[in-house]
Structures are given as structure tokens and as C-alpha cells.
Regions:
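A glycine-rich beta-to-alpha transition motif near the start of alpha/beta enzyme domains, typified by
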Residues: 1-331, 335-339, 343-400
Length: 400
């Protein structure tokens, strides 16, 4: 058995195993096998003698010091598909990004400064910088606070995440086809208008009405074979466009994590997964997220992409979003975005006239506010509020 230091952390509405890169084999080709043994995923010999749980997917983060002046730490994210024994590191997890700053502070990778420490994170998956503002006390990250995140019980210490220049991390373009709206040919249906956007992660959006939905549906959709087949087809076709699968039919096994599917509709009143009423006036876009089943909230990377699309004319999200003149949803907390352009983009004059807007997404778990800063049709940054907490820290014994 191989002893490996490990930390189990909740970030937003997700959880992951965190490893320091120095504690893993130098040969990175050995990492996928180690991760699967650590999690005890299906068809690995570890089985019950591991950290795995009855989930179809698992998450792993590997952290190391950054070697340049533009960031403090490197963050490499891995999605483990236990049903297909597949490890994918082509995209990021926005929720788990919120745990990187607290972890880096507590591991001594970043000097703790009270009351707030700024951690600059280089996400190796998307090759983009994420800045994390973490509350600190007595040299460690705080876990207790009054921040509320939909989909997470109770309150916690706020972690503000800003995804810097999030467009084109996978494909090199915000809109990889060059179009704000494309049309997918779906057998037995009229061509489906979709928006393909690569922003924090690749996402495909379509309007609920175009699929015969109201947009307020919840878990009942999981048992509708016609709808699941439609989502699978749309995901597969989008995966092919994004370069994640050679054929759309391969996406179900070869790109189980990306792209996210977002279904958008105008603001409307509904009850969330916990039975709480969400008012139409509290949101700018009503949305639902799917991969193979309904997401209980809305993925953070997909939130950045959806909110950005809602600001850009010609997308399906813009078509259904509340316009400013129609009245804005209520403020959901002060986001630390002052509209100034900082960092490596500060010297670009075309970005100095950027505009920031609060976009509130109403989803299955409640509402999420995203501060989106754009310059024309370029996304400068997207900022969200999350919470994070360490669940366990210790030694994980992994079969050799």
C-alpha cells in the first residue's frame, strides 16, 4: 500500500480529493490509475477499501506552487467517470475552484494575511487565471461566516471567485463556430437553435420552449426518455463541435463531463428542489442544467458562460433574459468588482471601457448571482460567491 497525503474538501456544491503534486508520482501517466484506486471506482481492485461513494462521477484536484509571477498556485482538475473508468482533465470545475484558495493558504503555499488574502490561481485545464478572495483569521482560512450559497445547507465564510478572461479556454474562441446561434438538426424535430459558448467551460444552451418545456421542470425530466435522448444528442453534437469527441455518438462515453447543457427561459416563478418558491422578479434568466440528469443547482463554470451569453445579443440566452429596462432582480450581495481592468489586460485600451452587469440565474437550487464584465463581445471576467470547508485531512492508503 502506498501512503498519500490527501484532503477531502467541499467547494460550493461539490466535493473533491485534494493532493499536493509533490506527493504524487513524478510520472503523471500514473495519476489516473492512482486516482481510480484511491476512489475505488468500478472495476478497480480497491473496491470498498477506498474513498469511493455511490456517485457516477468523482472529482480530484492537484495543487502545486506556480513557477511564474502571474499566479501563486497551479490547480489541475480531474473528473473521474466511475461508470466508464475514464479520467478527464480537459475542463475545470468552477465549484471546486473555490476550495483552492483556502487549501493553498492552509498548506502554506500562500502567505496568510488578515482579514482577507488574495490567491491567484492558474487553472492548468483552461490555462486561465482565477483570483480567489479568502477570509483569514489566525493564519488559517475561515470556514464560518454568514454567506449563503444555494444548494449548500447553512452558512459559511465567503469566497469570492473571479474567472479572468474566461473565454476560449478549450477552443481559443468564445464562440467556437463564430456564430452566436447555430442550428442542430435533430431527427423528428425542427432544427434546434443553440448557442455554443466556451467560457470558463464549454457549454451548449437552448431555449426551453424550443424543446417543448416551460423551463421550470425539475427531476421529472430525469424519467422522460424523449428528453434524455434529446439532451444526449445535443450534448454529443456540441462535444463534436468543441473537439471533445470525434463523433457525437462517442460523447456519452468519452466526454461525460463536458460540455454542460443549459436550458434557458424567461424569468418565471417556480418551486426549487427544496420546495421553496423562487419568484420571477428575483432572476434575470431561468435555467436548468443537465449532463445525464438534472443538476441540483447550476454549475459555476456554466453560470459564468450562461450569464455572459445573456449579455451578448444574438445568443439564445440573450433572447430570454430580462432586459435592464424591464427591471432588475434584487441584489444578492456586494460582489467585489469595481469595473477596473487589472493584471495583464490592464494595458489594453479597448478593455478600459468595459461594463459590469449583475446577472441572476434562477435554477433548480435557487438563485446564483454572477457579475459579468464585458468589453464589446469579449468577456473580461466573471465573479461569483461560493463557500468552502475542509471535511477531512489525513493519509490515504492506495494499492500499489
Amino acid at each position: 500500500m502506498r501512503p498519500v497525503p490527501c484532503t477531502y474538501i467541499r467547494g460550493g456544491t461539490s466535493r473533491a480529493l485534494f493532493f499536493m503534486e509533490k506527493d504524487l508520482p513524478q510520472d503523471k501517466s500514473l495519476w489516473p490509475g492512482l486516482f481510480m484506486k484511491a476512489l475505488g471506482v468500478r472495476r478497480t481492485p480497491a473496491g470498498l477499501s477506498a474513498m469511493g461513494m455511490d456517485f457516477p462521477t468523482h472529482k480530484v484536484a492537484v495543487i502545486s506552487p506556480h513557477k511564474g509571477p502571474d499566479a501563486d498556485v497551479d490547480y489541475n482538475f480531474f473528473q473521474i467517470d466511475s461508470e466508464n473508468d475514464y479520467v478527464d482533465n480537459r475542463g475545470n470545475c468552477g465549484n471546486m475552484s473555490s476550495a483552492v484558495g483556502p487549501f493553498a493558504i492552509d498548506e502554506g503555499l500562500v502567505e496568510a494575511r488578515e482579514p482577507e488574502t488574495l490567491v491567484r490561481i492558474y487553472n492548468t485545464n483552461t490555462r486561465r487565471i482565477i483570483t480567489s478572495r479568502v477570509q483569514v483569521k489566525d493564519g488559517r482560512s475561515c470556514t464560518q461566516g454568514d454567506a449563503v450559497v444555494c444548494g449548500v445547507p447553512g452558512t459559511g465564510s465567503p469566497v469570492w471567485l473571479s474567472f479572468e478572461n474566461p473565454g476560449g479556454g478549450l477552443t481559443g474562441k468564445l464562440f467556437p463556430t463564430g456564430n452566436k446561434t447555430d442550428y442542430f438538426a435533430i431527427p423528428g424535430r425542427e432544427d434546434l437553435p443553440v448557442t455554443l459558448i466556451d467560457c470558463a467551460n464549454p457549454v451548449v444552451l437552448f431555449r426551453a420552449a424550443d424543446a417543448g418545456l416551460t423551463g421550470t421542470e425539475l427531476t421529472s425530466l430525469n424519467s422522460r426518455k424523449d428528453f434524455i435522448d434529446l439532451v444526449g444528442r445535443v450534448r454529443g453534437m456540441a462535444a463534436q463541435v468543441f473537439g471533445l469527441a470525434d463523433r457525437w455518438e462517442d460523447a456519452a462515453a468519452k466526454s461525460t463531463y463536458m460540455p454542460f447543457v443549459g436550458i434557458v427561459s424567461p424569468p418565471q416563478t417556480y418551486k426549487d428542489m427544496d420546495g421553496n418558491q423562487v419568484e420571477a422578479g428575483s432572476m434575470d434568466v431561468c435555467c436548468r442544467s443537465f449532463i445525464t440528469r438534472l443538476h441540483r443547482a447550476y454549475p459555476i463554470a456554466a453560470s459564468i458562460a450562461t450569464a455572459a451569453a445573456a449579455k451578448i445579443a444574438g445568443t439564445v440566452a440573450y433572447d430570454v433574459a430580462r432586459r435592464p429596462e424591464e427591471g432588475k432582480g434584487p441584489e444578492a450581495g456586494a460582489l467585489p468588482a469595481d469595473g477596473a481592468v487589472t493584471g495583464p489586460e490592464a494595458g489594453r485600451p479597448e478593455l478600459q471601457a468595459s461594463s459590469a452587469s449583475r446577472i441572476i440565474l434562477g435554477h433548480a437550487g435557487g438563485c446564483t448571482a454572477v457579475e459579468v464584465e464585458t468589453a464589446g463581445e469579449e468577456v473580461v471576467r466573471g465573479t461569483v460567491l461560493r463557500t468552502a470547508c475542509i471535511i477531512m485531512k489525513g493519509i490515504l492508503w492506495v494499492e500499489e
